[in-house]
């Protein structure tokens, strides 16, 4: 057979193989979608079976014996005998495991590792024990995401996903168990490293780049490979919105080096990891002067609006979490993406993976997550945002099963996991938005107890976010917007006051700062007062009663919040899970922020307050 005929036959064979895999993928999609329907139709029955299975497999655990379960696996005994707990309640057991005690403390199955919290959940890294087969449950939930997405966005098997994914170097507990973020655990697992080919889940980033603990080398390689494959990219994403913005910032800083590598067909000497160099060499197979010139032309314009769709023109959506605290980044992502849809696909934490968004292309403000009943046993603690906090020694409110959730009510999620956490308060506040079959759907409201407080006032993350958004509208006429913010309750003044740190971005052609310096100061002072007007009645009452001082805005120079993130990562935070803290109290972070302040502004008057209005 002639060489050309051989090549054609090989190409045809490969095409047939790909087509066959695509057909198989469609069949798997149908099976996965039916699985979702089956689980959600029989939600409460599945929950009862899951609880019985958890209690049966852990009936030899010291924790369940201590609380008198005595091998019982029924829901009634469990609720009557096992208490609702927080991390502090479980700390003694967790420390025993971390220090090397291998007895069946909370689980009859061996604890294989600890999953660390992000480092920004109430300011504390927590160690969450997990077991080997938990990876199977996480993988199962991941396997449901694309079948749902394919209902809304066709043709995703015809291209690739540009995802910026990272790990961090893990630590060991005194007893020798790994302690690492949940995504680091997953990316380093065989489930991820040896995943079978799936035409709907092809990444531009080499696995070697994702698994590199050096953040610069990892980002550089992932960005370079993403640029080389620009025509094939159909979706762009990261775990959190902040991670995707960090990638755009990286492109702004390093596009010249990236273009040089593309032009010469060589990889920068700054990337020294051999496995990355080998992987990138396969992607960067030959010089591409045309692509290099394109990168230089687009990035050299200093016009970054719509840069994502300019660099990756076939992108159909952004795959990022933009709920909760990440909602802050929606305007900036719209700016850089040219208004692409943003898909929030799943809801998970270090403690447990919970569920998925069955309408992933909905507006970010409408995102609701459907809880999958096979992931763990879930209960709800009623939460009244207007009620005074309970005393620490007060019994918690009576919990309700998810099947009995009321639409419109807010609840705190309480979980029981296969790894041995029993009736554990996660700290997430959720609002019931409806049901899919018998499964409740929730909007993520906020993390509990992320507060500013000077006197009797308590301002949570959602209130602070709303106040910042209201004040930022005053900057819009000048082409300025808030890139990032955080806050602190400054008790060094008498009375104490709220301090809010803003980092600004000015769009091309914007009129900021105003020509008159005095006008600029006036705008910021109005922003201070606008924020105060948006805060709750207790705060405004305190201001009028001089129990709280005027709110202060401190404007910081560009890049400050990247420095804050770099500092957090240097202290062990995960680059994947990092979220800029909305309230800070850690001295070195406050010192860093204050050292970058370029101007300070105070509210010029007290906000309106009436005891008869909220």
Swiss-Prot record:
It comes from the Eukaryota. Signal peptide: none annotated. GO terms for biological process: response to auxin; response to light stimulus. Expressed in roots, flowers and callus. The gene is GH3.2. GO terms for cellular component: cytoplasm. Keywords: Ligase. Induction: By auxin. It comes from Oryza sativa subsp. japonica (Rice). This is Probable indole-3-acetic acid-amido synthetase GH3.2. It holds the Pfam family GH3_M. Belongs to the IAA-amido conjugating enzyme family. It is an enzyme of class 6 (ligase).
């Amino acid at each position: 057979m002639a060489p050309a005929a051989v090549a054609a036959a090989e190409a045809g064979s490969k095409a047939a193989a790909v087509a066959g895999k695509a057909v198989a993928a469609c069949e798997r999609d149908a099976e996965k979608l039916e699985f979702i329907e089956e689980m959600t139709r029989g939600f409460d029955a599945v929950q009862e079976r899951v609880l019985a299975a958890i209690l049966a497999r852990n009936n030899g655990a010291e924790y369940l014996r201590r609380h008198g379960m005595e091998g019982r696996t029924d829901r009634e005994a469990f609720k009557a005998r096992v208490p609702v707990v927080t991390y502090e309640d479980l700390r003694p057991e967790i420390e025993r495991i971390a220090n090397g005690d291998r007895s069946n403390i909370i689980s009859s199955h061996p604890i294989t590792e600890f999953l660390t919290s992000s480092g920004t959940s109430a300011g504390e890294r927590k160690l969450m024990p997990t077991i080997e087969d938990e990876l199977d449950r996480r993988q199962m939930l991941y396997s449901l995401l694309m079948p749902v997405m394919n209902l809304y966005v066709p043709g995703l098997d015809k291209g690739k996903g540009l995802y910026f994914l990272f790990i961090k170097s893990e630590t060991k507990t005194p007893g020798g168990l790994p302690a690492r973020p949940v995504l680091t655990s997953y990316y380093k697992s065989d489930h991820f490293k040896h995943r079978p080919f799936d035409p709907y889940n092809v990444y531009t980033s080499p696995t070697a780049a994702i698994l590199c603990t050096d953040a610069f080398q990892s980002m550089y390689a992932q960005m370079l490979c993403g640029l080389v494959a620009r025509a094939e990219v159909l979706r762009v994403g990261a775990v959190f919105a902040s991670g995707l913005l960090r990638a755009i910032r990286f492109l702004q800083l390093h596009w010249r080096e990236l273009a040089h590598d593309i032009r010469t067909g060589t990889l920068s000497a700054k990337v020294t990891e051999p496995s990355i160099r080998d992987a990138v060499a396969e992607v960067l197979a030959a010089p591409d002067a045309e692509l290099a010139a394109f990168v230089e032309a687009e990035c050299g314009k200093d016009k970054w609006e719509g840069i994502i769709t300019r660099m990756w023109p076939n992108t159909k959506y952004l795959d990022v979490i933009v709920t909760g605290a990440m909602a802050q980044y929606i305007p900036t992502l719209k700016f850089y993406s040219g208004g692409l849809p943003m898909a929030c696909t799943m809801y998970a934490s270090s403690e447990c993976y919970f569920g998925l968004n069955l309408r992933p292309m909905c507006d970010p403000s409408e995102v609701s997550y459907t809880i999958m009943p096979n992931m763990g046993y879930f209960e709800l603690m009623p939460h009244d945002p207007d009620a005074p906090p309970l005393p620490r020694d007060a019994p918690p409110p009576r919990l309700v099963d998810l099947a009995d959730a009321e639409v419109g009510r807010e609840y705190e999620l309480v979980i029981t996991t296969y790894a041995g956490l029993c009736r554990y308060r996660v700290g997430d506040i959720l609002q019931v938005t409806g049901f899919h079959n018998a499964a409740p759907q929730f909007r993520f409201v906020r993390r509990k107890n992320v507060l500013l407080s000077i006197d009797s006032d308590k301002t949570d993350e959602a209130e602070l976010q709303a106040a910042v958004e209201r004040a930022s509208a005053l900057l819009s006429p000048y082409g300025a917007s808030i890139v990032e913010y955080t806050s602190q309750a400054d008790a060094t003044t008498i009375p104490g006051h709220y301090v809010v740190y803003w980092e600004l971005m000015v769009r091309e052609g914007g009129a900021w700062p105003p020509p008159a310096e005095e006008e600029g100061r006036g705008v910021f002072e109005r922003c201070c007062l606008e924020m105060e007007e948006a805060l709750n009645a207790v705060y405004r009452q305190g201001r009028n009663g001089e129990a709280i001082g005027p709110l202060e805005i401190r404007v910081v120079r560009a890049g400050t919040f990247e420095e804050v993130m770099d500092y957090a990562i240097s202290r062990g935070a995960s680059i994947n899970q990092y979220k800029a803290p909305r309230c800070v109290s850690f001295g070195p972070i406050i010192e860093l922020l204050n050292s970058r302040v370029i101007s300070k502004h105070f509210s010029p008057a007290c906000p309106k307050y009436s005891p008869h209005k909220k």
